[in-house]
Curated annotation (Swiss-Prot):
N6-carboxylysine modified-residue sites: 201
Cofactor annotation comment: Binds 1 Mg(2+) ion per subunit.
Gene3D superfamilies on file: Ribulose bisphosphate carboxylase, large subunit, C-terminal domain (3.20.20.110), RuBisCO large subunit, N-terminal domain (3.30.70.150)
Binding site residues for Mg(2+): 201, 203-204
Top-level enzyme category: lyase
Protein name: Ribulose bisphosphate carboxylase large chain
Modified residues annotated as Phosphothreonine in this record: 330
Quaternary structure note: Heterohexadecamer of 8 large chains and 8 small chains; disulfide-linked. The disulfide link is formed within the large subunit homodimers.
HAMAP family cross-referenced by the UniProt entry: RuBisCO_L_type1 (MF_01338)
Residues that bear Phosphoserine: 208
Lineage: Eukaryota, Viridiplantae, Streptophyta, Embryophyta, Tracheophyta
Localization per Swiss-Prot or TrEMBL: Plastid, Chloroplast
Superkingdom field: Eukaryota
EC number per UniProt: 4.1.1.39
């Protein structure tokens, strides 16, 4: 045994197991501006004190393990360990607590969402001492944010590229999502864009299947884009899904899209992975492509209130990793989404500085230090009667995306697009004239029906459609 080993082994090391809270629960700790801060909803197993549970989360997501180890003496735990610095009860929940954990910045690789999540939401979520664990929010410090490129272009650059201002953008997901040939798919794209939409979209699971290979789809969609642009005089786009089985194949598809001269590609960022997403975002910035992000698989992670991760964390991660659009729920459509919580993470996507606001689920003040913003996309079970509410909720910097609400029009795809464009223009004009969309929305739509038979037909078809189911993931304190 070397003298150095003898010295280290003899200075204060004692083998065995000790409580996590003795090392990792530090209520006296004052957080630093460079710390990554996390708010965890912790449900300890019966008999496990909240302080021990919170300390266990801090330990197992940073430097700790289940027993003391000799090599702790070879580093500075005080410099590198995570710290549970505050615990508070959850209103109305006797067995749940919010544990606040601070992580030193040196624990994380620069510019890597993958590495950040591997620590913070890694093995600790399977820890036996916890009945359930959910990451509610993260504070990303400016020092770490500055190591990321973020969205390829951002909101203002996108508007300049499209020459579209003063209103939400309109989109449509082509349906049926699977089974169409590339030529019929391109036809639907053309009809929707010609009818007045700004964008059409590949559904998230359209990649390169036997019925429609990706290269054929890209070619027919590009033809549809150029034809509709020539006929309308407007700039158009189609989200060509570049998601693939390998990063190399994904980039190959993005390269082909750029060669066709289209303006935007798409990625499924959770199923594709953050490493792939960041790589694609870098390619898109370097080559002038906008990047639309779909959040397929998010509800597996974020829907249950006591375990997993809230979507506001996934939204922050996407802004770091890179994307110009991301699906963010609708509040009024068929998919899960509490209004105040949704508005909270919509602001976190778009704004440069967002204050702590627990009434909207925002646990920490977030300074994005001029990282470009992301357009929230409202999509899922929406139609023309929802247009006033969507315009009022999401504002101008958003994409309102009607799939069935366009293609389900009784007269066809182009009239469906016309109906949505007329409804949107009517709502924007009414808002600009000072009318209250929340109160007068239905009246505004009825007035517009008088001079748009396409809108009148759409209103008749969907007048009884409602998705009145309670939200599962409500903010704390809501009934």
């Amino acid at each position: 045994m070397s003298p150095q080993t003898e010295t280290k082994a003899s200075v204060g090391f004692k083998a065995g197991v000790k409580e996590y809270k003795l090392t990792y629960y530090t209520p006296e700790y004052e957080t630093k501006d460079t710390d990554i801060l996390a708010a965890f909803r912790v449900t300890p197993q019966p008999g496990v004190p909240p302080e021990e549970a919170g300390a266990a989360v801090a330990a197992e997501s940073s430097t700790g393990t289940w027993t003391t180890v000799w090599t702790d003496g070879l580093t500075s735990l005080d410099r590198y360990k995570g710290r549970c610095y505050h615990i508070e009860p959850v209103p109305g929940e006797e067995t749940q607590f919010i544990a606040y954990v601070a992580y030193p910045l040196d624990l994380f690789e620069e510019g890597s969402v993958t590495n950040m999540f591997t620590s913070i939401v890694g093995n600790v979520f399977g820890f036996k001492a916890l009945a359930a664990l959910r990451l509610e929010d993260l504070r990303i410090p400016p020092a770490y944010t500055k190591t990321f490129q973020g969205p390829p272009h951002g909101i203002q650059v996108e508007r300049d590229k499209l020459n579209k201002y003063g209103r939400p953008l309109l989109g449509c997901t082509i349906k049926p999502k699977l089974g169409l040939s590339a030529k019929n798919y391109g036809r639907a794209v053309y009809e929707c864009l010609r009818g007045g939409l700004d964008f059409t979209k590949d559904d998230e699971n359209v990649n390169s299947q036997p019925f429609m290979r990706w290269r054929d789809r890209f070619l027919f969609c590009a033809e549809a884009i150029y034809k509709s642009q020539a006929e309308t005089g407007e700039i158009k786009g189609h989200y060509l899904n570049a998601t693939a089985g390998t990063c190399e194949e994904m980039i190959k598809r993005a390269v082909f899209a750029r060669e066709l001269g289209v303006r935007i590609v798409m990625h499924d960022y959770l199923t594709g992975g953050f490493t792939a997403n960041t790589s694609l975002a870098h390619y898109c910035r370097d080559n002038g492509l906008l990047l639309h992000i779909h959040r397929a698989m998010h509800a597996v992670i974020d829907r249950q209130k006591n375990h997993g991760m809230h979507f506001r964390v996934l939204a922050k991660a996407l802004r770091l990793s890179g994307g110009d659009h991301i699906h963010a729920g609708t509040v009024v459509g068929k998919l899960e989404g509490d209004r105040e919580s949704t508005l909270g993470f919509v602001d976190l996507l778009r704004d440069d500085y967002v204050e702590k606001d627990r009434s909207r689920g925002i646990f920490f003040t977030q300074d994005w230090v001029s990282l470009p913003g992301v357009l929230p996309v409202a999509s899922g079970g929406i139609h023309v009667w929802h247009m006033p509410a969507l315009t009022e909720i999401f504002g101008d910097d958003s994409v309102l995306q009607f799939g069935g609400g366009t293609l389900g029009h009784p007269w066809g795809n182009a009239p469906g697009a016309v109906a949505n464009r007329v409804a949107l223009e009517a709502c924007v004009q009414a808002r600009n004239e000072g009318r209250d969309l929340a109160i007068e929305g239905n009246e505004i739509i009825r007035e517009a029906c008088k001079w748009s038979p396409e809108l009148a037909a759409a209103c008749e078809v969907w007048k009884e459609i409602r998705f009145n189911f309670p939200t599962i993931d409500k903010l704390d304190g809501q009934a």
